[in-house]
């Protein structure tokens, strides 16, 4: 296509990740400039409130958007090309493989839910960050033509003989990248899930003394909704 590529990836300052190392390796293979961003973890409590201000609601929103608070300030280009939400077409999560892969109807039900506006790996909340930095967030996997292609396939057709074989076989460039691991959850592989668990002892953030971060996320969404109705934190806690 004649486009100049500059590759970006991130890792936590406490947790080197496979995705980060592989992105750097592939950039070297194709002779692309590469910028690796180490996300500082010491600011997590403050960053939590930044995510609340972005109206993050679910645990997935908080965890998936968090690192990009630090990535976008480092991006110099106008257009940001991403494979955002690609994994939704493949149904590679544990939940999908247990409950949704066995019939086309179930598989499409899973994908319909995944790509619903309030889900989609937190796309709407990610885009708020890209808009804040005046970037054009380009997401080919969210186009209608790509959706139609994948929805025409069953779970077996998109995952056998190996994950993402349609895409990897369509471009000769993938032959140069070597072996790539199967799907890795962004939040788990990067260490973000474990990092967010460290907020549970924080009484200001975990103000209802929850044992799960997903419940803390819901509490803050509820608090945001309550504030919109001009109530106070004390009223919300009652």
PLM segments and residue spans:
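Peripheral terminal appendages
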Residues: 174-238
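ATP-dependent adenylate-handling active sites, centered on carboxylate activation for C-N bond formation
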Residues: 1-174, 187, 191-199, 233-237
